[in-house]
Amino acid sequence: MRRTKADAEETRQGIIDAAERLFFRNGIDKTSLEQIAAEAGVTRGAIYWYFANKTDLFMAMVDSVPLIWEDVIARAVVEDHPNPLALLETIALDALDLLGSDLRRQRIYRIMTRCAYQGDLARVRDRQQEALTRQRALFIAAFNLASQKGQLNPAWHPETAAHSFDWLFCGMIMEWLHFEQNFDLVAAGTASIQGLFAQFRSTAARTMETA
């Protein structure tokens, strides 16, 4: 029977899913293509039809989900936004909710935290670094805009506020992933972010949001 494009894509995705399960369970270095083929119910030759090697397969798995920083970048259109602090707070809380409920993202992100980014895998590290750099620039732009609008507490310098938020947001996510979810990301993260943004807001901003 002739295989359709949909059949081929289903097989390819099945291989990626099998690799994800084994990478998560055993680690990348301790997972062979033979094991992935057995897990996926295909031959090793079938894997080579879709992927050049294990590194290529790993890259396909990583590319199958956006980085959480990339999700933030896609939504954080802060230029001329009437309330940039509310925008950032909402985006951050939504990101925590998504990560806390999406088991597949959790597995892939945790696989990535265990990876030594050497050789061909360095491009994954470069992708993360690029996304983090862009996210930080957006945070700074948002806090600068909030300051210009009189919405940022004058006790905070915009860049200091942006860095503080960045370190809290990224740091708690990385700790949660690295140390195997040792706290409630959504509950603790929500309380921390809301508390920090309460400190960020000027009196005028708080009045505007409660009006």
What do these predicted ranges mean?
Residues M1-N26, K30-V42, T55-M59:
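Basic, helix-initiating cap at the start of DNA-binding domains
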Residues R25-D29, D80, D102, K149:
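Short coil/turn segments at alpha/beta junctions that flank glycine-rich nucleotide-binding fingerprints
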Residues G41-F51:
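Short hydrophobic/aromatic patch on the recognition helix
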Residues A60, A74-R105, P158-F165, V186-T190, ...:
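Hydrophobic alpha-helical connector segments
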Residues L67-E70, A74, A86, T90, ...:
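Amphipathic alpha-helical packing segments from all-alpha helical-bundle domains
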Residues A86-L87, G100-Q129:
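Amphipathic alpha-helical segments used for helix-helix packing
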Residues D97-S101, R114, Q118, A141, ...:
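Amphipathic C-terminal alpha-helical segment
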